[in-house]
Curated annotation (Swiss-Prot):
GO terms for biological process: autophagy; cellular response to unfolded protein; endoplasmic reticulum calcium ion homeostasis; intrinsic apoptotic signaling pathway in response to endoplasmic reticulum stress; negative regulation of calcium ion transport into cytosol; negative regulation of endoplasmic reticulum stress-induced intrinsic apoptotic signaling pathway; negative regulation of hypoxia-induced intrinsic apoptotic signaling pathway; negative regulation of immunoglobulin production. Belongs to the BI1 family. InterPro entries: Bax_inhbtr1_CS, Bax_inhibitor_1-related. This is Bax inhibitor 1. Residues 1-29, 74-86, 134-139, 188-206, 228-237 are cytoplasmic. The gene is Tmbim6.
C-alpha cells in the first residue's frame, strides 16, 4: 500500500476526547474572543504608528490597566456580557497602542521584522496551545510555581539592570522571557480547561490571559529579532 495514498483524518486530529463538550464550547468562545482582541489590537497599533491620532504613553498605559481592572471587577453574567466585551475590546485597543513604540523601533531597523515576528509568534502560540490541548489534563499545571519564580527573577534582574545598564543582561532577559512565555501558554491553556471543567465559564477573562501571553511573546520575539538585525548591520560596517 502506498503511504502517499493515505488520507489524513482531520476529524481525528481535532478530537479532544479528554475534554468535555461543554468545555470545548467554552474554548471556542475563548478563542473567538481572542481573535477579536487580535483584530482590535492591530487597529490600536495602526492608530499609533500610522495615524498618530493616539500615542502610546502614560495615559494609554493607565487606561489599559484601568479597563483590565474594571473588566476583572465586573462579574460574569449574561446581563454584563456585552459590557464586558466592550471593556475587553477597549483593553485590547490600548494594548495595541502600547505596542507602538516597539513597532516603530523595529520598522526603523528593518520593516521585515514585523511580519517575521508575528508569524513566528503565531506558530509558537499555536504549537504550544495544541500541545496543552492534546496533553493529559493537568500535566502542565506544575509549571505554575516555576514560571512565577522565573518571573520574579526577571523582575529583580530588570530592576538591577537600571543601575548596571548591561545590554547583555537585557538581552538575556529577553530570551528568558520568551522561554517563560512559552511556558505560560502551556500553563494558562490547561488552567483555563481546568477552570471550565469546574464551572468557571468566564470566557472573556480567560481570553485576557491568552491575549497577554501572545502580546508578550510577540514583543519579546520582535525585540530579539531587532537586536539581532542591528548586530548584523554593525558587523557589516
Amino acid at each position: 500500500m502506498n503511504i502517499f495514498d493515505r488520507k489524513i483524518n482531520f476529524d481525528a486530529l481535532l478530537k479532544f476526547s479528554h475534554i468535555t463538550p461543554s468545555t470545548q464550547q467554552h474554548l471556542k468562545k475563548v478563542y473567538a474572543s481572542f481573535a477579536l482582541c487580535m483584530f482590535v489590537a492591530a487597529a490600536g497599533a495602526y492608530v499609533h504608528v500610522v495615524t498618530h491620532f493616539i500615542q502610546a504613553g502614560l495615559l494609554s498605559a493607565l487606561g489599559s490597566l484601568a479597563l483590565m481592572i474594571w473588566l476583572m471587577a465586573t462579574p460574569h453574567s449574561h446581563e454584563t456580557e456585552q459590557k464586558r466585551l466592550g471593556l475587553l475590546a477597549g483593553f485590547a485597543f490600548l494594548t495595541g497602542v502600547g505596542l507602538g513604540p516597539a513597532l516603530e523601533l523595529c520598522i526603523a531597523v528593518n520593516p521585515s521584522i514585523l511580519p517575521t515576528a508575528f508569524m513566528g509568534t503565531a506558530m509558537i502560540f499555536t504549537c504550544f496551545s495544541l500541545s496543552a490541548l492534546y496533553a493529559r489534563r493537568r500535566s502542565y499545571l506544575f509549571l505554575g510555581g516555576i514560571l512565577m519564580s522565573a518571573m520574579s527573577l526577571m523582575l529583580l534582574s530588570s530592576l538591577g539592570n537600571l543601575f548596571f545598564g548591561s545590554i547583555w543582561l537585557f538581552q538575556a532577559n529577553l530570551y528568558l522571557g520568551l522561554l517563560v512565555m512559552c511556558g505560560f501558554v502551556l500553563f494558562d491553556t490547561q488552567l483555563i480547561i481546568e477552570k471550565a471543567e469546574h464551572g468557571d465559564k468566564d470566557y472573556i477573562w480567560h481570553c485576557v490571559d491568552l491575549f497577554l501571553d501572545f502580546v508578550t511573546l510577540f514583543r519579546k520575539l520582535m525585540l530579539i529579532l531587532a537586536f539581532n538585525e542591528k548586530d548584523k548591520k554593525k558587523e557589516k560596517k
